[in-house]
UniProtKB/Swiss-Prot annotation:
Subunit-level organization: Component of the Sec protein translocase complex. Heterotrimer consisting of SecY, SecE and SecG subunits. The heterotrimers can form oligomers, although 1 heterotrimer is thought to be able to translocate proteins. Interacts with the ribosome. Interacts with SecDF, and other proteins may be involved. Interacts with SecA.
GO term, biological process aspect, one: protein secretion
UniProt-annotated location(s): Cell inner membrane; Cellular thylakoid membrane
Function: Essential subunit of the Sec protein translocation channel SecYEG. Clamps together the 2 halves of SecY. May contact the channel plug during translocation.
Name of the protein described by the UniProt record: Protein translocase subunit SecE
Gene (name only): secE
Source organism per UniProt: Synechocystis sp. (strain ATCC 27184 / PCC 6803 / Kazusa)
């Protein structure tokens, strides 16, 4: 089989222009998308943050107590053995 010889062109100038255009398009699209975002009010942000923190505390407390119970259960056979 005959391989085609690759044609090399000096297109670094074209690539740099394309990169600048691509970055410009990306930034413009990002600004458009951020303009569509509905940002929460301060009150909503605070109340939802408090809810998340309370749920983290609750779940971590439950996991702690379940761990303590299983730790106690696993030590029982060795206490009477």
């Amino acid at each position: 089989m005959v391989k085609k010889e690759a044609v090399r062109t000096d297109s670094t100038e074209d690539n740099s222009v394309d990169n600048v255009q691509a970055r410009s398009n990306f930034i413009a699209a990002t600004k458009d998308e951020l303009a569509k975002v509905v940002w929460p009010s301060r009150q909503q942000l605070i109340s939802e943050s408090v809810a998340v923190i309370l749920m983290v505390i609750l779940v971590s407390t439950v996991i702690y107590f379940v761990d303590q119970i299983f730790g106690w259960i696993t030590k029982q056979p060795f206490l009477f053995g």
